[in-house]
From Swiss-Prot:
Organism: Cupriavidus pinatubonensis (strain JMP 134 / LMG 1197)
Domain of life: Bacteria
Classification via PANTHER family: HISTIDINE BIOSYNTHESIS TRIFUNCTIONAL PROTEIN, HISTIDINOL DEHYDROGENASE HDH
SUPFAM superfamilies found in the cross-reference section: ALDH-like
Protein's recorded name: Histidinol dehydrogenase
Keywords: Amino-acid biosynthesis, Histidine biosynthesis, Metal-binding, NAD, Oxidoreductase, Zinc
Lineage, uppermost ranks: Bacteria, Pseudomonadati, Pseudomonadota, Betaproteobacteria, Burkholderiales
Group of enzyme by EC: oxidoreductase
Active site: residue positions: E341 (proton acceptor), H342 (proton acceptor)
Record flagged with keyword NAD: yes
UniProt function note: Catalyzes the sequential NAD-dependent oxidations of L-histidinol to L-histidinaldehyde and then to L-histidine.
UniProt-listed Enzyme Commission number(s): 1.1.1.23
Similarity comment: family membership: Belongs to the histidinol dehydrogenase family.
GO MF annotation terms: histidinol dehydrogenase activity; NAD binding; zinc ion binding
Residues annotated to bind Zn(2+): Q273, H276, D375, H434
C-alpha cells in the first residue's frame, strides 16, 4: 500500500427491520456539543475585559492570539479602498463566479422579502380602531467570518446579503487574520455583498467588541456567522445583550435515495459534508440493499483521491451510516426524526417524497441537485439549523434582520367596548391601575 493510500474505512450499516434499530439510530445521532468549562471560563474573562477596557483589550488579545500587533483599532480596520482593490485584483474567472453567486443569493432573498411577511400591514375595524404590524430592519449587524484555513467567502455572501436586502443600515464584519495574513477572496466578497466596515479581529474578543461596543467599533444589534468553540461560547454568553443567529453544530447531510442515482454521485455527496470536519455527519437512507453496497464500494474507491481523506474517513467512520429501510415512505419518516441540516431526495419523483418531509434545514430535490450547489450559488441561504434544531428553527433569512412592532390605534368608540373588557380582566387579575387606566377612557367619553 502506498503511503498516500488508506485502508478501507469502516461505515455503520443499519437496517430499520432490526429490533434494535431505534437504539442504534440514537447512537449514530448522539452528539453533545457540551460546554468546555475551561473554554467557557476563558471566554467569560475575555468578554468582561473587553466590556471594561474596550479597544485596549481587543488589541491585546489580537496580539496574543493572532500575532498581529497594532497601535490602535483604526489600524485593524480595512478601508473601502482596500476592499475595492481586493475585488479588482481577483482572477477574472474567480471574480465572475463570486459575482454570479452573489447575484443569485440577492435575487432569492429579494423574493423572500416579498413572500415572507416582510412588509408592514394594518386594518381598520368598524368603530374606527386600527390594528396592524410595523416591520423594521435592524439598525446595525455584526458578521463574524472565520479566518485562516477556515475562511469561506461564501459565508460572507450568505450572512451579509440578506441583511442588506432587509434594509440593515450598517453591516460590520470581523475576520481574524492570523499572522497578519488576509484572505483576499473574503475581502472581495465583503465588497460585493455591501459590507460597510471590516475589522481584522476575531475570537471571543471580536464577539465582545460587537456586543458591547468600543470607542472605535460601535455596538451592534445582532451577531451572525460561524466560528470556533470560543466564538460559539462567546455568542452564547452575549445573547440577550444582542441577538444571535444560532449556535451551529457540525455539518450534516442526509441522502434519501431510491437506488436510481449513480452511486458515485451519492458517495461524493456524502463526502461533501464529511470533509468539513471529523464530527460532520453523512447518512444514506435507501430501500435497496444492493444499491447501498454499491455506494459503500464507491466510498472506498473514491476516498484515496480526496485531499481531505483523513478528515472524511474519520467523519464517515465516526458519525456516518448507511441505512436500509423498508421503503421510501419509511425513509421520509426517519428523515423527519433526524431533522437534518441538508436533506437530498435523490429519486425519480422527488416532489412526491418532499411532501412528506416536515423537518429539514434545506431540501435538495432530484439527482442533479447536489448539496454543494446550495452551499455556494443556488440562492437559498446556506446558514442552516443543525443538531435536530430544524424541528423548530429555520435557515438564516431576511426575517432574521427585521423585527416587528404591533400597531394599535383605538378610536373613541373602540375605547368604550375594549375598555370594559380590559377592566373586567384587570380586576380579575388584581391589577387596579390597569383597570382604571381603561375605565378613565370610557367613563369620561
Amino acid at each position: 500500500m502506498n503511503a498516500t493510500e488508506m485502508e478501507n474505512v469502516s461505515i455503520r450499516r443499519l437496517d430499520s427491520s432490526d429490533p434494535r434499530f431505534a437504539q442504534a439510530l440514537r447512537e449514530v445521532l448522539a452528539f453533545e456539543a457540551g460546554e468546555d468549562e475551561a473554554i467557557d471560563r476563558a471566554v467569560a474573562q475575555i468578554l468582561a475585559d473587553v466590556k471594561d477596557r474596550g479597544d485596549a483589550a481587543v488589541l491585546e488579545y489580537t496580539q496574543r492570539f493572532d500575532r498581529v500587533e497594532a497601535a490602535s483599532m483604526g489600524a485593524l480596520e480595512i478601508s473601502q479602498s482596500e476592499l475595492e482593490a481586493a475585488l479588482e485584483d481577483l482572477e477574472p474567472k474567480r471574480r465572475a463566479a463570486l459575482e454570479a453567486a452573489a447575484a443569485r443569493v440577492r435575487a432569492y432573498h429579494e423574493k423572500q422579502k416579498i413572500e415572507c411577511g416582510s412588509h408592514s400591514w394594518e386594518y381598520t375595524e368598524a368603530d374606527g380602531t386600527m390594528l396592524g404590524q410595523k416591520v423594521t430592519p435592524l439598525d446595525r449587524v455584526g458578521i463574524y467570518v472565520p479566518g485562516g484555513k477556515a475562511a469561506y467567502p461564501s459565508s460572507v455572501l450568505m450572512n451579509a446579503i440578506p441583511a442588506r436586502v432587509a434594509g440593515v443600515k450598517e453591516i460590520i464584519m470581523v475576520v481574524p487574520t492570523p499572522g497578519g495574513v488576509r484572505n483576499e477572496l473574503v475581502l472581495a466578497a465583503a465588497q460585493i455583498a455591501g459590507v460597510d466596515r471590516v475589522f481584522t479581529i476575531g475570537g471571543a474578543q471580536a464577539v465582545g467588541a460587537l456586543a458591547y461596543g468600543t470607542a472605535t467599533l460601535p455596538q451592534v444589534d445582532k451577531i451572525v456567522g460561524p466560528g470556533n468553540a470560543y466564538v460559539a461560547a462567546a455568542k452564547r454568553r452575549v445573547f440577550g445583550t444582542v441577538g444571535i443567529d444560532m449556535i451551529a453544530g457540525p455539518s450534516e447531510i442526509l441522502v434519501i435515495c431510491d437506488g436510481t442515482t449513480d452511486p458515485d454521485w451519492v458517495a461524493m455527496d456524502l463526502f461533501s459534508q464529511a470533509e468539513h470536519d471529523e464530527l460532520a455527519q453523512s447518512i444514506l437512507l435507501c430501500p435497496d440493499a444492493d444499491y447501498i453496497a454499491q455506494v459503500e464500494a464507491s466510498i472506498q474507491r473514491q476516498l484515496d483521491s480526496m485531499p481531505r481523506r483523513e478528515v472524511i474517513a474519520a467523519s464517515i467512520s465516526g458519525r456516518g451510516a448507511l441505512i436500509k429501510v423498508r421503503d421510501m415512505e419509511e425513509a421520509c419518516e426517519i428523515a423527519n426524526a433526524i431533522a437534518p441540516e441538508h436533506l437530498e431526495i435523490s429519486a425519480e419523483n422527488p416532489r412526491q417524497w418532499s411532501e412528506k418531509i416536515r423537518h429539514a434545514g434545506a431540501i435538495f430535490l432530484g439527482r442533479y441537485t447536489s448539496e454543494s450547489l446550495g452551499d455556494y450559488c443556488a440562492g437559498p441561504n446556506h446558514v442552516l439549523p443543525t443538531s435536530r434544531t430544524a424541528r423548530f428553527s429555520s435557515p438564516l433569512g431576511v426575517y432574521d434582520f427585521q423585527k416587528r412592532s404591533s400597531l394599535i390605534e383605538v378610536s373613541e368608540g373602540g375605547a368604550q367596548m375594549l375598555g370594559q373588557i380590559a377592566a373586567e380582566l384587570a380586576y380579575g387579575e388584581g391589577l387596579q391601575a390597569h383597570a382604571r387606566s381603561a375605565e378613565y377612557r370610557f367613563k369620561r367619553s
